[in-house]
Amino acid sequence: MIPYRSRTSTHGRNMAGARGLWRATGMTDSDFGKPIIAVVNSFTQFVPGHVHLKDLGQLVAREIEAAGGVAKEFNTIAVDDGIAMGHDGMLYSLPSREIIADSVEYMVNAHCADAMVCISNCDKITPGMMMAAMRLDIPVVFVSGGPMEAGKVNIDGELRAVDLIDAMIEAANPDRTDAEVDEFEKNACPTCGSCSGMFTANSMNCLAEALGLALPGNGSTLATHADREALFRRAGRRIVELTKAYYEGGDTGVSARGIATKAAFENAITLDIAMGGSTNTILHLLAMAREGEVDFTLADIDRLSRVTPCLCKVAPAVQNVHMEDVHRAGGIFGILGELGRAGKLDTSVRTIHEDTMAEALSKWDIAVTNNPEVQELFLAAPGGVRTTQAFSQARRYKDLDTDREKGVIRSAKHAFSKDGGLAVLFGNIAEMGCVVKTAGVDDSILKFSGPAVICESQEEACERILKKRVKAGDVVIIRYEGPRGGPGMQEMLYPTSYLKAMQLGKECALITDGRFSGGTSGLSIGHVSPEAAEGGAIGLLHEGDIIEIDIPNRTINAKVSAEEFAKRRAEMDAKGAAAWKPVEERPRKVSRALKVYAAHVGNASLGAVRLDP
């Protein structure tokens, strides 16, 4: 038996004062022997993925208390990357992940909570909470707010499914009228929930299922659908069972690290590669593993990327497939089932809901189960009504998408490609690696060579693209945008969207030590490590240097000799205080908080986590 953490503050004569304070929160004598479970919410009216979470914490809390626990809710911050995009607000997005992780750790440890339910949804909130869970290593259940419904726009006589990225691209398209852009804007984000494609938020909530830390349906059941309520209720009941198993039964295998082992991380990245998830997920998985002392590195991701097929393509990789379509095809367990049959998963790992992944697949993979409740779950469809309310509709599809040859989810035999949707590249400008979402790269440019167009900020890149100073065949280099150099490792969604708008999406490459939105597609290579600000070779490139990209062979190099690089490095170092900084000072406000972040953060190959002093 493992002592309950909460008894530190609820038992013993010396804790009379603490108990007095607990009583002031509503606890009574009968509560002091029960587990105290933190309900970690992230409600905010700033973010559509979180606007509907206000009452859901108390929904979970009631289930916890009905099952024999004491629930205590608190909130953490949530940044909307789409609203923060394209201005200095984006400097705060990635650093907010560390603030979220710290705040959860601080609250849970300060109050000696025994376990937690994490109610997350959008880009940095899920990974931030997961980092905290890995630090704390207590029982945890993740339940997200769910995906947004895809928007619908009638363009050129055709009804198209659209999302936030379409609005951004069309706004920069000179061929679109103001009225057409307005139509995209008003319909791109029709409901509450995380943006509807396989962007970072949805990618992370899907990976939570593969890690074993979330219930089936977590990543794909729409925020608006009535079926999602059952996930929240079940999460509240299940955390009490896990907590008692851990403390009273001594089962350490149900803690966060007990579930999220190295094998589970490998399952998660295998899913990520198979579904062409956001490149940000690589950053977050590396960070989570580091916080949990799991030996999972970029080398593991590189190894698995070479042998994992691409089984699912979702927006932004393709136009008309969104999370609601993945759900109809069986959701994440539909993809995991195909990976399992292909021998690409370790099905012996535990999950929060079954003793092994094999058992979970037998129950939740629509290709093998006849359970009508499971089939009913994956028939949950979009309602098509603008709303900010959770569980506000109960519409259902007439049938499931079980076509594994040409459907949304493919079998390994009928894969979109034999190697998957994410790749790690190495070379003389990325000695510690960089990443690319291959699911969004046209086959014609998997090998690409062209002259470098050097930009020392995202703003400079946007200006050059919009002023048509980037032409077909160019390789746009955006540097000094890494975790330290930005600081904050901004997402480069606007430059990639503008390349598309200028009809250069299949004609140019973009390389950066920054990162990309989950909405990015095209030959967009990010996370270049080491970054320019720490002496990376990307900082030594000159305008016109020929850059060679070879995704099939996982290489990225500048046609610059080692001797020339050494000469350039010596010249850079000789600049003293001006070395490894943009040539011209950028009009960028860097607060004290961001300076502190920059002083301690590691590069992307390490997950951009803070390094120990």
Curated annotation (Swiss-Prot):
[2Fe-2S] cluster binds at residues 122, 195. Pathway: Amino-acid biosynthesis; L-isoleucine biosynthesis; L-isoleucine from 2-oxobutanoate: step 3/4; Amino-acid biosynthesis; L-valine biosynthesis; L-valine from pyruvate: step 3/4. Keywords: 2Fe-2S, Amino-acid biosynthesis, Branched-chain amino acid biosynthesis, Iron, Iron-sulfur, Lyase, Magnesium, Metal-binding. Mg(2+) binds at residues 81, 123-124, 491. Its EC number is 4.2.1.9. Binds 1 [2Fe-2S] cluster per subunit. This cluster acts as a Lewis acid cofactor. Its cofactor is [2Fe-2S] cluster; Mg(2+). SUPFAM superfamilies: IlvD/EDD N-terminal domain-like, LeuD/IlvD-like. PROSITE patterns: ILVD_EDD_1 (PS00886), ILVD_EDD_2 (PS00887). The keyword Transport does not apply. Gene3D superfamilies: IlvD/EDD C-terminal domain-like (3.50.30.80). The active site is at 517 (proton acceptor). GO terms for molecular function: 2 iron, 2 sulfur cluster binding; dihydroxy-acid dehydratase activity; magnesium ion binding. It comes from the Bacteria. GO terms for cellular component: cytosol. The modification N6-carboxylysine is found at residue 124. It catalyses: (2R)-2,3-dihydroxy-3-methylbutanoate = 3-methyl-2-oxobutanoate + H2O; (2R,3R)-2,3-dihydroxy-3-methylpentanoate = (S)-3-methyl-2-oxopentanoate + H2O. One of its GO terms (biological process) is L-valine biosynthetic process. Belongs to the IlvD/Edd family. Homodimer. Functions in the biosynthesis of branched-chain amino acids. Catalyzes the dehydration of (2R,3R)-2,3-dihydroxy-3-methylpentanoate (2,3-dihydroxy-3-methylvalerate) into 2-oxo-3-methylpentanoate (2-oxo-3-methylvalerate) and of (2R)-2,3-dihydroxy-3-methylbutanoate (2,3-dihydroxyisovalerate) into 2-oxo-3-methylbutanoate (2-oxoisovalerate), the penultimate precursor to L-isoleucine and L-valine, respectively. This is Dihydroxy-acid dehydratase. It comes from Hyphomonas neptunium (strain ATCC 15444). The gene is ilvD.
